[in-house]
């Protein structure tokens, strides 16, 4: 209760613009709470940390941030956050939120601006489709290995439950897969196969963590790797 009424969300560019506008109005040492420390929340914390202006609180129901990364990279993130005096509240689920206060089961924290980066509720359209077709999923429209939920109907990205974590990397690959199938008029019978090309997260002070199935990087070299990856993505995609 109170999340929709009292929090900003970070899902779209429009959301990001609104957050930026609100941050500009805050006084020095204002209390900014970031709820959800996955990729989105952790990168936001890294960017806020760089401003050296806010008192930041990182909140998550799990035992730490970025649980999709290995333990070493998680610890590097925590070390950087602790060095910068970020208030860390983990293993704590939000009970309800009121103006200026976030309540947990046995605790509470005050805020001037709260940004929700936790799980995003399934869209009304996805809910409606699942209900009409008797599909059961809380993540999105339940699709088969061809990303179909009916013979000539497909779903990808955040609106689809394809059994893969809904990242931008996954959504891009899904889009390319369907584009290829549309272009060849579905003559092949190839199922969608997600290829994990690695995970990257900016954590603040020109430090990033990066890992794939071959290597794991952190710190300044992780940031350099991230800069190179972003360059090649813009240049060749």
What are these regions (language model features)?
Residues 5-28, 101, 110-176, 180:
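FAD-site-proximal beta/loop scaffold in flavoenzymes
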Residues 20-56:
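Rossmann-like NAD(P)H-binding beta-loop-alpha module
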Residues 35, 59, 156-157:
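Active-site flanking residues adjacent to catalytic metal/cofactor-binding acidic residues
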Residues 40, 64, 121:
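Conserved Rossmann-like nucleotide-cofactor binding loop
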Residues 44-92:
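Rossmann-like dinucleotide-binding cores of NAD(P)H-dependent redox enzymes
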Residues 90-101:
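A conserved short coil-to-beta-strand element within the FAD-binding core of flavoproteins
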Residues 105-107:
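Short strand-coil-strand connectors
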Residues 174-237:
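C-terminal, flexible cofactor-proximal segment of oxidoreductases
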